[in-house]
Amino acid sequence: MSTGPGLGYHIVDSGGSALPGSLQTNRRLSQWLRFRPDGIVEVSSGKVEIGQGILTAVAQIVADELDVDLARIRMVPATTAASPNEGVTSGSLSVEQSGSALRWASAEARAIFLDAAAQRLGVDAQSLEVRDGEIAGPGNLRTSYWELAEHETGGGLLDRDATARIAPKPATARRLAGVAAERLDIPDKVFGRPR
């Protein structure tokens, strides 16, 4: 079911098609996204900010797909040991590769959280709405990404491989991607802070 912003998700029949971008070779959702108890979403990309604006662009993409405020997104600096292996950083191609991978990973993460919320609240997932990571259902039922992540035992809700079954939102439902935003990398550069 495809719905407006903040509602539902869209399951696609990919016909066995490959996952987009770097998600093909880095399928583990928990390698890309982590939900911290303090209400922050940590996002890992294998691309390095070298002035092309990838940190800001990717943060906007993730915030759109998850229906969270851009201020909740924390981009984790790329490291060889912990980041998805996305090969080289090459200018605007980085947004195409990492951005598409994170768009699909975030869309699937959102659907996973909506399914978990539906089970926890005892309602149909399609009746739930997400606003800034808070999930609301009929009769004022509420939970959040962070509450669900905190109550998950073991490896967590995202400790699984991406499937390409959940399509990202259509461009018309995006509110942040493609809109000018303050660059996340500029303050560190201005104040000489290492990232």
Predicted regions and their residues:
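Cofactor-binding beta-sheet edge motifs in enzyme active sites
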Residues: 1-195
